[in-house]
Regions:
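Catalytic phosphate/metal-binding cores of nucleic-acid and nucleotide-processing enzymes, i.e., regions
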Residues: 1-99
Length: 99
């Protein structure tokens, strides 16, 4: 089965998280889970982060943007990753954790 463009982005993101030794998971949505939660949530060297993966020109929904803002307001790092910046996840985490 062929991967969707977003699945390809997620695969690259997850590999970088593994490479740096970050703790991460994919939140459950629907049912008891919440909607609008970023695709990948985790912690790296004490830094809470949340990543929304998108492909092409896709943008976060208003609810996703709201959740990302709540995370940022609480002191977490959150950003949107796509094909253009998907290879910079490890670098971004290292820089933020050492700031």
């Amino acid at each position: 089965m062929a991967q969707t463009p977003e699945a390809k982005v997620k695969k690259v993101v997850v590999q970088q998280l593994k490479d740096v030794g970050a703790y991460y998971f994919y939140p459950v949505t629907g049912g008891y889970g919440g909607n609008g939660v970023p695709d990948v949530v985790g912690c790296y060297l004490g830094l809470f982060f949340a990543i929304e993966c998108k492909a092409g020109r896709n943008k976060p929904t208003k609810l996703q943007e709201k959740n990302m803002q709540w995370i940022a307001d609480a002191g977490g790092l959150t950003w949107v990753v796509n094909e253009e910046n998907m290879r910079s996840v490890a670098e971004t985490l290292r820089a933020a954790a050492n700031a």
